Every structure is written in structure tokens, then in C-alpha cells.
């Protein structure tokens, strides 16, 4: 099983300044050293803001992925190549021209599998 696009973008953020909020409401801002596929994050040079508003400086921190509420990544990652490929995939699904497009639409509308309807309900049973 391959990793999804959001995790790929998270890996792209390694080495950049990110903000991470945990489920307990603490906010960590610092350099993302490493991110794992399960969203475990190792960060350095951290400014942590606790729920009561206190601010502290930490040298290193390791946050378990299941305890992360959300991450704020740098805006420069909007141009990441994996996001470009997602845009291109959606681009080709517009209306085509000619008979081929009509046939494609008919095939797509038919569906798959057994769901062929009830048939003739007035048919004599055997």
C-alpha cells in the first residue's frame, strides 16, 4: 500500500518551519526534522504555546502522529509536484467531442455488476 498525497506533502516539508497543534491544544512551531508515514514528527528549535498562554522554548521535541490535530505547512508547498499531478488527473475529464465522447458517456452511465433492475414483474413464475 502506498502513502497518500497529504503524507507526501508532509515529507516535502522536512527542513522547513511548520506549526503543529496537538489534541491537548498545545501549539509547537519549529523546524521539521523528520516526518514518518504515521505522522510522527521530530522538530527542533521549538516555540511551544501552552493552552493557558504560557510560551516556552524547546530544543527538540518528538510528537506522536495520533496526537496531532493539524499541521500548518509553508505556503511554498502549494507548488509541490505531487499536487500538480492531482490537478492534471482532474483536467482530462471534461466533455469531449464527437461520437467517441457520446459512447464513453453511455458506457459510464450504464454501471457495472448485477443491478439490472426488476425485469418484467408480470412474468409467469415457474
UniProtKB/Swiss-Prot annotation:
Q: Does the keyword Ribonucleoprotein apply?
A: yes
One term of GO molecular function: U7 snRNA binding
Compartments where found: Cytoplasm, Cytosol; Nucleus
What are the sequence repeat spans here? 110-111, 112-113, 114-115, 116-117, 118-119
Instruction: Quote the SMART domains the UniProt record gives.
Output: Sm
**What domain of life?**
Eukaryota
Instruction: Tell me where in this chain the PTM N-acetylserine is found.
Output: 2
Q: How does it assemble?
A: Core component of the spliceosomal U1, U2, U4 and U5 small nuclear ribonucleoproteins (snRNPs), the building blocks of the spliceosome. Most spliceosomal snRNPs contain a common set of Sm proteins, SNRPB, SNRPD1, SNRPD2, SNRPD3, SNRPE, SNRPF and SNRPG that assemble in a heptameric protein ring on the Sm site of the small nuclear RNA to form the core snRNP. Component of the U1 snRNP. The U1 snRNP is composed of the U1 snRNA and the 7 core Sm proteins SNRPB, SNRPD1, SNRPD2, SNRPD3, SNRPE, SNRPF and SNRPG, and at least three U1 snRNP-specific proteins SNRNP70/U1-70K, SNRPA/U1-A and SNRPC/U1-C.
Instruction: Provide the family line.
Output: Belongs to the snRNP core protein family.
Name of the protein this chain belongs to:
Small nuclear ribonucleoprotein Sm D3
Amino acid at each position: 500500500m502506498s502513502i497518500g498525497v497529504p503524507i507526501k506533502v508532509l515529507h516535502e516539508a522536512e527542513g522547513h518551519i511548520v506549526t503543529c497543534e496537538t489534541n491537548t491544544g498545545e501549539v509547537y512551531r519549529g523546524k521539521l526534522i523528520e516526518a514518518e508515514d504515521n505522522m510522527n514528527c521530530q522538530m527542533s528549535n521549538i516555540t511551544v504555546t501552552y493552552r493557558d498562554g504560557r510560551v516556552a522554548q524547546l530544543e527538540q521535541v518528538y510528537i506522536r502522529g495520533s496526537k496531532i490535530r493539524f499541521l500548518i505547512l509553508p505556503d511554498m508547498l502549494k507548488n509541490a509536484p505531487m499536487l500538480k499531478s492531482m490537478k492534471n488527473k482532474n483536467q482530462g475529464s471534461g466533455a469531449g467531442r464527437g461520437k467517441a465522447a457520446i459512447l464513453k458517456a453511455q458506457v459510464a452511465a450504464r454501471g457495472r455488476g448485477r443491478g439490472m433492475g426488476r425485469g418484467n414483474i408480470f412474468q409467469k413464475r415457474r
